[in-house]
Amino acid sequence: MTNIRKTHPLLKIINSSFVDLPAPSSLSSWWNFGSLLGVCLGVQILTGLFLAMHYTSDTATAFNSVTHICRDVNYGWLLRYMHANGASMFFICLYLHVGRGLYYGSYTYSETWNIGILLLFAVMATAFMGYVLPWGQMSFWGATVITNLLSAIPYIGTELVQWIWGGFSVDKATLTRFFAFHFLLPFIVAALVMVHLLFLHETGSNNPTGIPSDPDMIPFHPYYTIKDILGFLIMLTVLSVLVLFSPDLLGDPDNYIPANPLNTPPHIKPEWYFLFAYAILRSIPNKLGGVLALVMSILILAIVPILHMSKQRSMMFRPLSQCLFWLLVAILFTLTWIGGQPVEHPYIIIGQTASVLYFLIILIFMPATSLMENYLLKW
């Protein structure tokens, strides 16, 4: 008799995705981040659901409701810090996942890659709106500064900002709609994840060599299920240590001050995972130019497949491209550091230099190096 997992209409979908899925035999730990992101999303939706049961999206009570969650709700502090630090883990896994895709040439699966970029934007939007909800100083001023960027859009900018605010400033209407969207978006992200996996399973996984692995495939279960479970345990251990020992390590102390429209914090900055983009935004003196650079810093990923000039898919056997890739990583770390610094000398010029190099490496140096490597290999 055929196994029920291969015949049942629902179980056979799960079976073909997670049990009998043919997977390359050479996948390294860099391929763990997809499943880790799935766990992060699950943790965020669960903790977020329980937080939403106690949170009130009203300017008068939002800050106090978060305090109430931490002090009076059973394990409310754990839920709150798991959710806040879970977002950091989410972005660490996201950036490593994208970095893996860039290094090993996974972007040549264009549908999977483009859905991934959509997912990145959706998760960033969700995280931004979530940061506004505790209604602390950085929540309020972060929301004001970032939404105000839309006023740089010619002709419709001002009206657009007021439409998003629901008034003439960030206020009760803004907080309520941000809560509604923050609740809704993770489920849209979950749906996009399904589409992401659907397109991935059409082509099959890439592997570290970048060479087609059709002759050498192994079943996903038990080999990669056990490997993924090890990844889950490591990530959840790191998250637990962060939550239980230093829950405020990655947060901003200003967010423990209730939002006050009459008092601007000395340094307005977003959460650490947006600092690289914030540094690129600030490095351009013109408002519209800054906004365009900000959007392009992420959207540039969409043209990476077009800029792929190498005859090889992966960077595994391309030492010159590897050097450029790690230089790009160093530049992203530099931009993250600069984003958290005040706008003064020497930080301004460092940020501008790093921003220019970021775009130059992706748009010019990487394709040029690929062509040179082709020439050196007489291809």
Swiss-Prot record:
Function comment: Component of the ubiquinol-cytochrome c reductase complex (complex III or cytochrome b-c1 complex) that is part of the mitochondrial respiratory chain. The b-c1 complex mediates electron transfer from ubiquinol to cytochrome c. Contributes to the generation of a proton gradient across the mitochondrial membrane that is then used for ATP synthesis.
Subunit structure comment from the entry: The cytochrome bc1 complex contains 11 subunits: 3 respiratory subunits (MT-CYB, CYC1 and UQCRFS1), 2 core proteins (UQCRC1 and UQCRC2) and 6 low-molecular weight proteins (UQCRH/QCR6, UQCRB/QCR7, UQCRQ/QCR8, UQCR10/QCR9, UQCR11/QCR10 and a cleavage product of UQCRFS1). This cytochrome bc1 complex then forms a dimer.
Positions annotated to bind heme b b566: 97, 196
Domain of life: Eukaryota
Positions annotated to bind a ubiquinone: 201
Free-text cofactor note: Binds 2 heme b groups non-covalently.
Taxonomic placement: Eukaryota, Metazoa, Chordata, Craniata, Vertebrata
Additional information: Heme 1 (or BL or b562) is low-potential and absorbs at about 562 nm, and heme 2 (or BH or b566) is high-potential and absorbs at about 566 nm.
Sequence intervals crossing the membrane: 33-53, 77-98, 113-133, 178-198, 226-246, 288-308, 320-340, 347-367
Entry cofactors: heme b
Species of origin: Centurio senex (Lattice-winged bat)
Gene Ontology molecular function: metal ion binding; ubiquinol-cytochrome-c reductase activity
Listed InterPro entries: Cyt_b/b6_C, Cyt_b/b6_C_sf, Cyt_b/b6_N, Cytb/b6-like_sf, Cytochrome_b, Cytochrome_b_C_euk/bac, Cytochrome_b_N_euk/bac, Di-haem_cyt_TM
Signal peptide limits: none
Cellular location(s): Mitochondrion inner membrane
Biological processes, Gene Ontology terms: mitochondrial electron transport, ubiquinol to cytochrome c
Binding-site positions, heme b b562: 83, 182
Descriptive protein name: Cytochrome b
